Amino acid sequence: MNGPPDDRSEATADGDRAVVVAVIASTFFVGFGGGVVFPILPNLGAVLGISPFLVGLILSANRFTRLVANAPAGTLVDRAGTRTPFVVGLTVQGVATAGYIVAVNSGAPATWFLLARVAWGIGSAMVFATAYTIAADVSDGGTRGTNMGLIRGGVIFGFPTGLVVGGIVSEFYGTVAAFVVATVFALFASLLAYLLVPETHVEGDPRESVRPWDVDTSLPALTVGTVNFTVGFAYIGVVFATLVLFLKTNDISVLGLDAQGSSGVFMAVTVVSAAVFMFLGGYVSDQSGRRMPTLLTFLVVTFVGLSLFAVASSVPVLSLACVLVGAGQGGTSGPLMALLADLTPDERMGRAMGTNNVFGDVGGGLGPMVSLPLVDSVGFLPVYAACAVLPLAAGGLLVVGIYRETGELSPRVERPRGGTEDLSD
């Protein structure tokens, strides 16, 4: 009785690992395309005559699009499975990246950039909802944090590659060359997914309607989503959107690069740190059997990093701030997604992930629209200092929400052979 089940269990585990690797590879290559635009567009806006507010709107357009697309994408996953939305979403993102090339050579660059970012948002809503659902499908309580961190890390490792290429290649070979390379990477991601990613989710009735308001309003989804909002607002919405302007204003540079190239390097440091700690945070929360200690620790790390950003005036201090902010954001990401999956029934998993993405996109989308005009009027210090408080507030909210849901301040995680408590019971 023991032999065959163990063999099947080992084969299943190997298959699950292969699925995770395939999703990581696909999200890495499409993440590259997403990173290219960040170090280019804020500076390119001045050259093309695009106002700071409109630049912020363009950078945020993909996230605001996902506000509408995230919930239907999650519902679609619960009803139709993961493979098709994942492949289609990656393909849409590849086509959207090609829109950057059209924008630079167009007489209406702002319009084309905006359309490309909207299309990117539709594709990424499908990709994120499916990728996280796949991670939940092939995981249990003992591996969920690690797998969530690894899959999220696929996007993250692709993103700094895009940041570096976007900043450096555009400086030496031109903006169009950087966008062409990004397009090739993004389209390759869709081909990779088509060849390697199988169906993992239980299919529902594909004839049912998919509505933008079909969201998960459970306490765990709202609590985790709010934490995701605060981290996304500070990390993507403020720091990344304003970094190139911060470097130019304070005359900080690295490797002899200008503000645009240097911002790509600093962003890459931040995101590589995030990617490393995504895996470590998820792994630690799996091994300890508790998500909350890891989450709260890394929220404090985020606070320290953002505080350093507010006072940074040299390359060493700014580099340390980037490492800490990245570590804090990454360290919370895997355990946070795993915590949501721990507390969500399988039949609602796609909607829960979609709802969580809505909150993150509100934060990341609202940030540039608020931060770019604010730093222009009041300076960087007040904006960065205010952002530093957000992770602490998020930690307090997380403790309250999880205690109300589970009756414990630090509930244990379900482990397949460890006999610990199931969070969803």
Where are these regions (language model features)?
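Primarily marks hydrophobic transmembrane alpha-helices of the MFS/SLC 12-helix fold
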Residues: 86, 294-295
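Hydrophobic core of transmembrane alpha-helices in multi-pass small-molecule transporters
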Residues: 28, 110-126, 317-331
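C-terminal membrane-cytosol helix-exit motif in multi-pass small-molecule transporters
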Residues: 184-203, 394-402
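Juxtamembrane intracellular "pre-TM" segments in multi-pass secondary transporters
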Residues: 2-16, 198-226, 414-425
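Cytoplasmic helix-loop-helix junction between adjacent transmembrane helices
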Residues: 114-157
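Helix-loop-helix hairpin linking two adjacent transmembrane segments in secondary transporters
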Residues: 151-197, 381
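C-terminal ends and interior cores of transmembrane alpha-helices
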Residues: 91-107, 300-313
